[in-house]
């Protein structure tokens, strides 16, 4: 009885690939399909410093401009054409990128509003061409 069950199991396993080939899969060298991964479309819009200051707490923003000054360990001054805002950039967010005040950067992060101040908690930073 055990041999019979084993033979049935082997037959079931051997017939599964044959059934799968009939329903799809690879059928020859010319059957390659182009599969592009990821999102294809416009990027999120870049926000200005002036408008970021009026957004709600925890709103996700993308800013493009320059980091012009270091205030403390993780706190910097970010400037674009509309004004300046403090940005909090943890050490782990730099990812080996070295930035000078002359470099144009794009930062993504969340608006962090306290009762008397607004800053951006940066999650990603990268250099961009001006």
UniProtKB/Swiss-Prot annotation:
PANTHER family found in the cross-reference section: PROTEIN YGIW
Location relative to the cell: Periplasm
Bias (Polar residues) ranges: 29-44
Organism ancestry: Bacteria, Pseudomonadati, Pseudomonadota, Gammaproteobacteria, Enterobacterales
Disordered, as annotated region: 25-44
Pfam families referenced in this protein's UniProt entry, alphabetically: BOF
Identification of the protein by name: Protein YgiW
Stretch forming the signal peptide: 1-20
